[in-house]
Amino acid sequence: MNLIDSSQERPLPKTRVACFCDQVIQGSDGVMTIVRIIDRVELNLTQPLPPETANNSTSLSHSVTFFTLLDEVQDWFGHSFELWGRAPSAGFEKQGELLFSEAKFPMGSLSLTFRAELNLYYPGNYEFEVRVQNRSIVTRSLQLIVLPPDIGRSGPGQQRL
């Protein structure tokens, strides 16, 4: 008796591009334009964080777009692709889901754009994964830097001390 799920035998799609950005614009010709690729978020606070923030009872909300372009997706029609996120020292939580249909399948590639409202609790690296059938396809991290109210942003060529 074969106890292996046949979906586990399918090769996973290959990642061509995966990044966080401000937005993704699709032109009339179908070409995707990624606006401002980011790998970190700096929050410059106007007042100190409340003490309960460290206990995860208060969070800062931040909107982010995650874009990925996948190849070799033919075997995954009708499946949902999910974006999962993990805060520093925490487990993964589902952030969003997109159903893969043929209409989103131009020339052998699949582009997925997840727009998520993230609840950020404390500074550090937040990990994100795109999954299909609970199998990880790609992982990217986003660093959260929280600047205290008394520290301003550094200008170009300046180092923050």
Q: For the regions a protein language model found, what residue spans apply to each?
A:
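Contiguous segments within soluble domain cores/interaction surfaces
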Residues: 2-132, 136-161
